[in-house]
């Protein structure tokens, strides 16, 4: 026992060489810590670090410095110096242009008075307490898209720059502009600039645009926190270049959209177009997420109210064409929030326009609905599809759409018999 205690509890007498080695080790450790601390102080004062300009303080104003467009409305502007660096750019004060038919007063709009006044005070503290300006330039544009034809429906599809396969799959399926006989559809993909600063990818996008003429792109960074800018880009494009469009759908690149059902059962081309019409999957009574670790986090100083106004899931909503200009203009007086669907709902509340429920609560789905030709022939949206899945299920639906439920029942009975035999 005594021997064990000496071995494990008591220090043996150290030689001079051992002491010197131990001192050298400790000295190296201390110097390493000092060096790391000095490096931290050095990098912490340089604005060019990617981590330095995070999205939390001003999540929607990140763009590229050094961009020079020779002609902002042409399809393929010069991209020289576009990949040099990213910097935050403060929104410039600008008086919002009010429509004569639009009441921009927040009075009487439930849950907005305190929010808008709080936004104003925060803006003044940070130097951005003014109506938003919208100054993002076009890199790719399609200004003549509605001059060549008079579409009944525009599909605004939010896509990431690198989602080339998703765009290809959508063109082959629900985004096919010749899908509905006698009904003109226009497809537009909404893009920002890749955060990876990939010159090869940008050249591929330019070539894709030359081939299909269905991409618009502006000079903001394409990130989750800039989805609101992406949607406003689409709204402004519709208001500017397709002001007389009857209907618009905004959706995402990972969605399954039954375009034929949308047109024939919801929009009904034989009827006069509606006005101030907005529908989708209604989100009613939702409270702001105050968990700072959540990507849906909403700081109380940006939105102090306890409930959001009614809004529609951003995975897919449909609105009358006249609302594009109204939503864009009213947005110039409301601070941009990174939750795009919530923000559009706030704009509608300020316009005193209530989203209306669809005829069937199951037609808009912000989750993935298990596939059957019967179910998918009676819905408008389903979420989270890979490009290969989209093509597979779309082709199956087209083959069975005239007797979708009968064929689905036969397939189910066949699978049941197969399992029983085996």
From Swiss-Prot:
Subcellular location: Golgi apparatus membrane
Main location: Golgi
Spans within the Lumenal topological domain: 46-422
Annotated catalysed reactions: an N-acetyl-beta-D-glucosaminyl derivative + UDP-alpha-D-galactose = a beta-D-galactosyl-(1->3)-N-acetyl-beta-D-glucosaminyl derivative + UDP + H(+); a beta-D-GlcNAc-(1->3)-beta-D-Gal-(1->4)-beta-D-Glc-(1<->1)-Cer(d18:1(4E)) + UDP-alpha-D-galactose = a beta-D-Gal-(1->3)-beta-D-GlcNAc-(1->3)-beta-D-Gal-(1->4)-beta-D-Glc-(1<->1')-Cer(d18:1(4E)) + UDP + H(+); a neolactoside IV(3)-beta-GlcNAc-nLc4Cer(d18:1(4E)) + UDP-alpha-D-galactose = a neolactoside IV(3)-beta-[Gal-beta-(1->3)-GlcNAc]-nLc4Cer(d18:1(4E)) + UDP + H(+)
Organism domain of life: Eukaryota
Membrane protein topology class: Single-pass type II membrane protein
Cytoplasmic side: 1-24
Record-listed E.C. numbers: 2.4.1.86
Residues that carry a glycan: 75, 100, 119, 176, 226
The keyword Transferase appears for this protein: yes
Residue segments, region Disordered: 90-110
Pfam families to which the protein is assigned, alphabetical: B3GALT2_N (PF19341), Galactosyl_T (PF01762)
GO molecular function per UniProt: N-acetyl-beta-D-glucosaminide beta-(1,3)-galactosyltransferase activity
Recorded GO CC terms: Golgi membrane
Keywords: Glycoprotein, Glycosyltransferase, Golgi apparatus, Lipid metabolism, Manganese, Membrane, Signal-anchor, Transferase, Transmembrane, Transmembrane helix
Residues passing through the membrane, by range: 25-45
Essential cofactor(s): Mn(2+)
Metabolic or biological pathway, per its Swiss-Prot or TrEMBL entry: Protein modification; protein glycosylation
A single BP term in Gene Ontology: protein O-linked glycosylation
Biological role stated in the UniProt entry: Beta-1,3-galactosyltransferase that transfers galactose from UDP-galactose to substrates with a terminal beta-N-acetylglucosamine (beta-GlcNAc) residue. Can also utilize substrates with a terminal galactose residue, albeit with lower efficiency. Involved in the biosynthesis of the carbohydrate moieties of glycolipids and glycoproteins. Inactive towards substrates with terminal alpha-N-acetylglucosamine (alpha-GlcNAc) or alpha-N-acetylgalactosamine (alpha-GalNAc) residues.
The family this protein is said to belong to: Belongs to the glycosyltransferase 31 family.
Protein name: Beta-1,3-galactosyltransferase 2
């Amino acid at each position: 026992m005594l021997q064990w205690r000496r071995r494990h509890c008591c220090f043996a007498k150290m030689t001079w060489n051992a002491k010197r080695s131990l001192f050298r080790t400790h000295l190296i450790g201390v110097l390493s810590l000092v060096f790391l601390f000095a490096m931290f102080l050095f990098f912490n004062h340089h604005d060019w670090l990617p981590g330095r300009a995070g999205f939390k303080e001003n999540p929607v104003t990140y763009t590229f410095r050094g961009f020079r467009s020779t002609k902002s409305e042409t399809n393929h502007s010069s991209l020289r110096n576009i990949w040099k660096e990213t910097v935050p750019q403060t929104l410039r004060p600008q008086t919002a242009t009010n429509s004569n038919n639009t009441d921009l007063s927040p009075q009487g709009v439930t849950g907005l008075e305190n929010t808008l006044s709080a936004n104003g005070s925060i803006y003044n503290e940070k130097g951005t307490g003014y109506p938003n300006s919208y100054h993002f330039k076009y890199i790719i544009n399609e200004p003549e898209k509605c001059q060549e034809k008079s579409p009944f429906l525009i599909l605004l599809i939010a896509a990431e720059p690198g989602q080339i396969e998703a765009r290809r799959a959508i063109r082959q399926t629900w985004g096919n502009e010749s899908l509905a006989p006698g009904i003109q559809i226009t497809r537009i993909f909404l893009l920002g600039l890749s955060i990876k600063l990939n010159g090869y990818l940008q050249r591929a996008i330019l070539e894709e645009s030359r081939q299909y003429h269905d991409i618009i792109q502006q000079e903001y960074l394409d990130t989750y926190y800039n989805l609101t800018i992406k949607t406003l880009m689409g709204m402004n494009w519709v208001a500017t270049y397709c002001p007389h469009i009857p209907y618009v759908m905004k959706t995402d690149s990972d969605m399954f959209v039954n375009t034929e059902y949308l047109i024939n059962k919801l929009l009904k081309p034989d009827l006069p177009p509606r006005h101030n019409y907005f529908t989708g999957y209604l989100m009613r009574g939702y409270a702001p997420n105050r968990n700072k670790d959540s990507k849906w986090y909403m700081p109380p100083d940006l939105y102090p109210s306890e409930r959001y106004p009614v809004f529609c899931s951003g995975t897919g909503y449909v609105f009358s064409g006249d609302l594009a200009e109204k939503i864009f203009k009213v947005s110039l007086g409301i601070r941009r929030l990174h939750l795009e669907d919530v923000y559009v709902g706030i704009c509608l509340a300020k316009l005193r326009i209530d989203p209306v429920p669809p005829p069937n609560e199951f037609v808009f789905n912000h989750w993935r609905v298990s596939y059957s030709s019967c179910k998918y022939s009676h819905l408008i949206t389903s979420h989270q599809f890979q490009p290969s899945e989209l093509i597979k299920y779309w082709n199956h639906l087209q083959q069975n759409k005239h007797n979708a439920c009968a064929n689905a029942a036969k397939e189910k009975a066949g699978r049941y018999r197969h399992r029983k035999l085996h």
